[in-house]
Regions:
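Boundary at the C-terminal end of the N-terminal hydrophobic targeting segment
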Residues: 16-23
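Short Gly/Thr-rich strand-loop-strand
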Residues: 25-59, 83-122, 158-192, 202-246
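A surface/extracellular/periplasmic glyco- and lipid-processing/surface-interacting theme
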Residues: 126-181
Length: 278
């Protein structure tokens, strides 16, 4: 038992190390820490971001470490959120980004603005906020550059992003639960287009994916079979419009909110072609 506790303690220390190294005002010369460092877990995150903590918890929040840095009369808050995995970190990033601005190549993705910067790398999401009285883009850029160097691990965005057809694609986000408002689709990527939306959910196995698809088919009473991937159905729903949902191995995907099921099926077939086989 003593060995187990020691192992868990060592694991926690190793896990927290990158966050502690990034939450450091000395990343950039001329900046000093103001006040005490911040650390929050799932049990008390609401004390720091009351009203929005649930959004982080849904993505698999583990812990947060942060500091307030000061240089002269200027200040920057640096907060490092550790998530359960890299996809979850990317999900939090896309939930917080400015959709009107492009995603920059920082880690798996980032944005640097005059008063705010954010990026994700591996299982960490980093958010910086400058004094709102004055833009500090140069300082934010310097902090982001040094912070990104101190986080090891994955710098590539989730592979699923490349599966969605790019024509007239507006955005792609990781939805932590109830994809398309359907509880059976617990977590997945949703792509918004000028017309309609697509999704991909990754199940544990082809068998579990088949079970989910079967339940979805029963939910849409007038569903008809469709020739897409391993199995599929199409339907015309009151809320989701023309739709087609398919299974390819352990992946469930499809298109919804199309003018009719035929159009949805054609788009779903294009999506299925880009999803890797098992």
């Amino acid at each position: 038992m003593k060995s187990l506790r020691l192992a868990l303690l060592m694991l926690a220390v190793v896990s927290a190390a990158p966050a502690a190294e990034v939450a450091d005002c000395h990343l950039v010369a001329g900046w000093e820490q103001q006040g005490s460092a911040r650390r929050f877990t799932a049990d008390n995150l609401f004390e720091y971001i009351d009203g929005n903590a649930e959004g982080y918890l849904l993505y698999g929040f583990v812990q947060m470490q942060g500091v307030t840095c000061q240089s002269g009369g200027e200040s920057i808050l640096v907060d490092v959120f550790e998530m359960t995995d890299a996809d979850s970190a990317y999900g939090v990033f896309t939930a917080n980004l400015d959709p009107s601005l492009p995603i920059q190549k920082v880690g798996m993705g980032g944005q640097i603005m005059p008063r705010r910067a954010l990026f994700c790398k591996d299982k960490y999401y980093v958010q910086l906020a400058a004094n709102p009285e004055k833009g500090q883009m140069a300082a934010l850029r310097a902090f982001v550059r040094e912070a990104e160097k101190r986080i090891p691990g994955r710098s590539l965005p989730p592979a699923a992003l490349s599966w969605f057809p790019t024509e007239k694609l507006a955005s792609v986000r990781l939805i932590p639960e109830s994809v398309l408002g359907l509880r059976l689709l617990k977590r997945g990527f949703v792509a918004h287009y000028e017309l309609g939306q697509a999704f991909v959910v990754i199940e544990a196995s082809p068998e579990s994916a088949a079970a989910v698809l079967s339940k979805l088919r029963q939910r849409f009473g007038e569903a008809a079979p469709a020739q897409v991937a391993d199995e599929a159905f199409q339907a015309d729903d009151q809320y989701l419009g023309g739709m087609c949902i398919f299974r390819k191995g352990r992946y469930i995907g499809g298109f919804a909110n199309m003018p009719n099921p035929k159009d949805a099926t054609a788009q779903a077939a294009s999506l299925a072609e880009h999803i890797p086989g098992m």
